[in-house]
From Swiss-Prot:
It catalyses: a 2'-deoxyribonucleoside 5'-diphosphate + ATP = a 2'-deoxyribonucleoside 5'-triphosphate + ADP; a ribonucleoside 5'-diphosphate + ATP = a ribonucleoside 5'-triphosphate + ADP. The lineage of its organism: Archaea, Methanobacteriati, Thermoplasmatota, Thermoplasmata, Thermoplasmatales. This is Nucleoside diphosphate kinase. The gene is ndk. The keyword Lipid biosynthesis does not apply. One of its GO terms (molecular function) is ATP binding. One of its GO terms (cellular component) is cytoplasm.
């Protein structure tokens, strides 16, 4: 089933020049970028995005971190996109993530963990409008007929 997922490359990914390498990994798995922005997340966006964590002790630090520098926000599309990206991302705690996953290869711990990915269709429905208008999602097809 084709579905969409929101992916954020967090400030540590941007500052460490990992954008291209991470997007390549996602595309190499057959996921298609249908929206992409390089942006500075506002405090309001961060608080809305992480609203499920509002009552947790780390909420304030999470908002401070995610707004500490630019991010890359993107919508990816493909078969089982949510599951595929979650597997590629690896464990939330980078120190426990398996080698070969994005966090396993690039993250040092749980706080600066490189990437966010929607964990369910419901999460995507909440998260996507924080970063994109529906009109910013681009429907397109691969040009395989031109290449092959």
């Amino acid at each position: 089933m084709t579905e969409r997922t929101l992916v954020l490359l967090k400030p540590d990914a941007v500052k460490r020049r990992l954008i291209g390498r991470i997007i390549s990994r996602l595309e190499d798995k057959g996921l298609k970028v249908v929206a992409l922005k390089f942006m500075q997340m506002t405090k309001d966006q961060a608080e809305n995005h992480y609203s499920v964590h509002r009552s947790k002790p780390f909420f304030k630090d999470l908002v401070t971190y995610i707004t500490s520098g630019p991010i890359v926000a993107m919508v990816l599309e493909g078969p089982k996109a949510i599951e595929v990206v979650r597997i590629l991302a690896g464990s939330t705690d980078g120190s426990k993530a398996q080698p070969g996953t994005i966090r396993g290869d690039f993250s040092m711990g749980i706080e600066k963990n490189i990437i966010h990915a929607s964990d369910s269709p419901e999460a995507y429905s909440h998260e996507m409008p924080i970063f994109f208008n529906e009109s910013e999602i681009v429907e397109w097809s691969y040009g395989d007929e031109i290449i092959y």
